[in-house]
Structure formats: structure tokens, C-alpha cells
UniProtKB/Swiss-Prot annotation:
GO cellular component, as recorded: large ribosomal subunit
Family: Belongs to the universal ribosomal protein uL1 family.
Superkingdom of origin: Bacteria
Keywords: Repressor, Ribonucleoprotein, Ribosomal protein, RNA-binding, rRNA-binding, Translation regulation, tRNA-binding
Protein name: Large ribosomal subunit protein uL1
Chloroplast as UniProt keyword: no
GO biological process: regulation of translation; translation
Purpose of the protein: Binds directly to 23S rRNA. The L1 stalk is quite mobile in the ribosome, and is involved in E site tRNA release. Protein L1 is also a translational repressor protein, it controls the translation of the L11 operon by binding to its mRNA.
Source species: Anaplasma phagocytophilum (strain HZ)
Complex and partners: Part of the 50S ribosomal subunit.
Gene behind this protein: rplA
Pfam families named among the record's database cross-references: Ribosomal_L1
GO molecular function, one term: structural constituent of ribosome
Amino acid sequence: MLDKNIVYTPEEGIDQLLKSTTARFKESVDVAIKLSTGDSRSGDSIRGVAVLPKGLGREVRVAVLAKGEYAKQAKDAGADVVGDSDLIEEIKKGRKLDFDWCIATPDFMSQVSAIAKILGPRGLMPNPKFGTVTFDIAKMVGIVKSGQVRFRSDKYGIVHVKIGDVGFSREDLMENLRAVVSAVQGLKPATVKGAFFKAVFLNSTMGKSFRITGLG
């Protein structure tokens, strides 16, 4: 449900959203950003990552594909799943992908490519653009577990990102919202001369949608 005639400041929008939730479970809070670049079918898909300073409100599970000292670093950093060629074989055979992110060292990517068709459609393929192909394993595990989220504009030119849940305070949701807005704004194509954001909305899983302004 959306009243298109009412536009709120980000703080007001969050307040309205938190007041309107009625579900008996902890609803997610999401931001939807309509971009001025058009739909993804025109080749203007926007994709990237944002680090949420207040996290996601849940455990983020991380898998690391590496060997030797890098595998040890991954375990020490708290990675949930760590393996090398054996793990790749398990994934080929249908191992449950019980993780949110997959990180790999650059020297291991030639082997990881063997499961690209499995990881790719689920958004789990290690990607240098997301920082998930790296030798700095410990640092990346920490970043991802702290609340890194990936985003990509859909076929309608809209970016959808979870910024927390209704158990978060207004201040924490604002911090996460600013982080997402900054990350998306940073990907504005040089060909876009005017405003990059056409409209921004906040909504919860089962609640209303609130249009906000003053972010981009």
C-alpha cells in the first residue's frame, strides 16, 4: 500500500514505517531506489556492494575457497565454511549452499570457475568488484560478516536492498540507509547529467511503502 501524494524525510519515513508494522514476526526493512538510467534491458544495470555500519540484524555466513595459510587465516577470522578442491567437489555433487557470501584467493579462481554455473545464479560467485577475490582473507571475512550487502538494479531500473529489520532503532536504520544511498550514488554513470535517483521508498515485509526524499 502506498500513498504517492505524501513524501517524507528519511527520518519521518522510518518513523512511519516502524509505527505501521503489525506482523507477529520481525519484518525486514528495505529500501527501493528507482534510478534514472532506465531498465536493465538497455544495458544500464547498476551493481555493487554496500557495507551496513549497523549490520543486518542476523548472522552472515561466509564460505572461503582457499588452501594452505589462506585457509588457516579464514578459519581464524571466523569463516563458517572453509575448503579447497574437496569443497569444490562437494558443491559439484550438490552440497547445500548454506552461506551468504563466498570468498576465494586469486590463485584459486581457476578451480572455482568449475562451479561458476552453480554459484553464479545464486549471486555467490567470488567477484573482484565486490572484494571477494582477494589474498586479504581475514579482512574480507570481517567486512562481509559485519554487514556487506550486494545490490543490482532489476529489469525496471530499481535497486532493492535490505537495511535492517523493525527491531532496529531509527538511528541505526538511518546509518544503514545512508551507507546504501552513498554506495549506489557512487555508481552514477557519467552519462547521467541530472538526478540519478527518480524516487526512493522504504517498506517492511508486510507493511506499507513510504516515499522519502532528500537522499540523492
